[in-house]
Amino acid sequence: MGKISIAIDGPASSGKSTVAKILAKQLNYVYCDTGAMYRAITYLALQNQIDIQAEEPLVALCVNHTISFQQAENGQRVFIDGHEVTEAIRQPDVTNAVSAVSKHAKVREEMVALQQKIGQAGGVVMDGRDIGTAVLPKAEVKIFLVASVEERAERRFKENQEKGIETDFETLKAEIERRDYLDSTREVSPLVQASDAVKIDTTGLTIEEVVAAIQNVIKQKGFELF
């Protein structure tokens, strides 16, 4: 059986990237973290003091800089023009600004075109906010992950602790709620479950349990990949 495309969508900190990395490794597929692309543009904008509300300068960043990936043992390394930014794009200032950048229609056009180029050959696990609806609408398997705000804030809190980033739990909850609102209400490619996506609530589930649930969906659709 040929390689398929797997789209995993969901709100911030719902577990998308973690399970997508594991699935890609299990299947020997390419893993594409589309959120990292928007984070990279956001990072460039902040570094160059570009107004994140101004669309044209952001589009220029997309056109004039090259975002690339390298597969790594624990997922994926991210580069801008050959310089690694894997950790830099996960800092709080980028996290809090990325929704404002990704709402711009022309920025999304540039990013979606690049993402579709990566995914056109199949054999890819791609995660983001609009993969099943806009980027890979014909993906054979579409998953929509959700989790409670409290659980997602707890995950982000632990991630920040491990990175030595001091954050307040209630502040994280407020930030996640704000991102949910921005992502789901933007005019271009809002966060929405594709009509043919399978919804999985990851609240209270381990990573292994979520991966197993997705494996079951794949098998139920007739793809014996494992």
From Swiss-Prot:
* Keyword ATP-binding annotated: yes
Main EC class the enzyme belongs to: transferase
Predominantly, its location class is cytoplasm
Where along this sequence does the record place binding of ATP?
G10, P11, A12, S13, S14, G15, K16, S17, T18
Similarity remark: Belongs to the cytidylate kinase family. Type 1 subfamily.
A GO biological-process term: nucleobase-containing small molecule interconversion
Q: Which UniProt keywords apply?
A: ATP-binding, Cytoplasm, Kinase, Nucleotide-binding, Transferase
Q: What EC number(s) does the entry state?
A: 2.7.4.25
Write down what this protein is called. Answer: Cytidylate kinase
Q: Name one GO molecular function term.
A: ATP binding
SUPFAM superfamilies (UniProt xref): P-loop containing nucleoside triphosphate hydrolases (SSF52540)
- Localisation per UniProt entry: Cytoplasm
A single Gene Ontology CC annotation of this entry is: cytosol
Keyword Kinase annotated:
yes
Q: Which reaction does it catalyse?
A: CMP + ATP = CDP + ADP; dCMP + ATP = dCDP + ADP
